[in-house]
């Protein structure tokens, strides 16, 4: 059995770790509220862009934007993968990567190749380690990312699709359901799926200035950028929620371990006292 001093040292070490996990839990609880507010603020813009894009896609124009054209054969797939920059978030990133690998294997079994761009340090490190072809990467965006920080990697994928180097593009991220539930999501970005709304049958059209191609090019790109940005905010909220839950579990486990070590310490101390009494009694009897 370990000595009382060693056990005391272990208890102190676990108590120090518990202080860290409790602090991280409280910080994440605070940040998750801010992340949810950011999600709410950005949604009206994303919804307005979706509605406008749906109207333009169904309008009477002779011009069909490349993002609306489905390629006949699917030989190369592109993924925009969003992860966190930091760890200590439970299995959030690993669960996403595991499902991502499953999706990649399905396409590879069909003879398709895979290219990706990564947003977040964890995704960049993971996919470089397993030798996936990475077209672009952006990291260390913080808790309040700006859209202009994402435009570069998004443009890489959009240009590749326009040039027919990619046949489909998917967006991969953790969707925030609630504090306890985050879901790995795979959304098809390209080709854009036609919106099913009340304007499906109409006899109207827009007046385009300077022309339909220029307007559609601008709107389609802004729309896809808004989707990626919204997914980024969802992933940030998911990260803080997962970290808060993970740190709460770590603090609870620390409490249990401290209780167990305290019991062991008490038993060791009791055994030492009993031995000392026995030695004193034995010495007195010998005299």
Curated annotation (Swiss-Prot):
The compartments listed are: Cell inner membrane
**An example of a Gene Ontology BP annotation on this entry?**
proton motive force-driven plasma membrane ATP synthesis
SUPFAM superfamilies in the record? ATP synthase (F1-ATPase), gamma subunit
Give the signal sequence positions. Answer: none
**Gene3D superfamilies (alphabetical):** 3.40.1380.10, ATP synthase, gamma subunit, helix hairpin domain (1.10.287.80)
Q: Which CDD domains match?
A: F1-ATPase_gamma
Q: Which InterPro entries match?
A: ATP_synth_F1_ATPase_gsu (IPR035968), ATP_synth_F1_gsu (IPR000131), ATP_synth_F1_gsu_CS (IPR023632)
A GO cellular component annotation here is:
proton-transporting ATP synthase complex
How does the UniProt record describe the way this protein sits in the membrane?
Peripheral membrane protein
Asked if the record carries the keyword Magnesium, the reply is no
* Keyword Manganese set for record: no
Q: Quote one Gene Ontology molecular function term.
A: proton-transporting ATP synthase activity, rotational mechanism
Q: How does it assemble?
A: F-type ATPases have 2 components, CF(1) - the catalytic core - and CF(0) - the membrane proton channel. CF(1) has five subunits: alpha(3), beta(3), gamma(1), delta(1), epsilon(1). CF(0) has three main subunits: a, b and c.
Q: Which PANTHER family match?
A: ATP SYNTHASE GAMMA CHAIN, ATP SYNTHASE SUBUNIT GAMMA, MITOCHONDRIAL
Q: Which family does it belong to?
A: Belongs to the ATPase gamma chain family.
Task: Give the protein's recorded name.
Answer: ATP synthase gamma chain
Q: Which organism is it from?
A: Xylella fastidiosa (strain 9a5c)
């Amino acid at each position: 059995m370990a000595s009382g001093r060693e056990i005391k040292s272990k208890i102190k070490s676990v108590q120090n770790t518990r202080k860290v996990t409790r602090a991280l839990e409280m910080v994440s609880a605070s940040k998750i509220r801010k992340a949810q507010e950011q999600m709410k603020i950005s949604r009206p813009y994303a919804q307005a862009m979706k509605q406008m894009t749906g109207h333009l896609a169904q309008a009477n124009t002779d011009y069909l934007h490349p993002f609306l054209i489905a390629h006949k054969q699917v030989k190369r797939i592109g993924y925009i993968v969003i992860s966190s920059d930091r760890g200590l978030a439970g299995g959030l990133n690993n669960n996403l990567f595991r499902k991502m690998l499953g999706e990649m294997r399905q396409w590879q079994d069909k003879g398709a190749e895979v290219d990706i761009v990564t947003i977040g340090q964890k995704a960049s490190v993971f996919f470089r380690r397993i030798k996936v072809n990475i077209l672009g990467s952006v990291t260390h965006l913080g808790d309040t990312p700006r859209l202009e920080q994402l435009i570069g990697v998004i443009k890489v994928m959009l240009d590749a699709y326009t040039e027919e180097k990619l046949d489909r593009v998917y967006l991969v991220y953790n969707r925030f359901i609630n504090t306890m539930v985050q879901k790995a999501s795979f959304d098809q970005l390209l080709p854009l799926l036609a919106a099913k709304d009340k304007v499906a049958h109409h006899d109207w059209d827009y007046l385009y200035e300077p022309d339909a191609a220029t307007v559609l090019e601008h709107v389609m790109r802004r729309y896809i950028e808004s989707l990626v940005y919204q997914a980024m905010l969802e992933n940030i909220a998911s990260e803080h929620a997962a970290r808060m839950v993970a740190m709460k579990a770590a603090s609870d486990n620390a409490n249990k371990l401290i209780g167990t070590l305290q019991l062991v310490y008490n038993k060791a101390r009791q055994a030492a006292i009993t031995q000392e009494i026995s030695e004193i009694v034995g010495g007195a009897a010998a005299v």
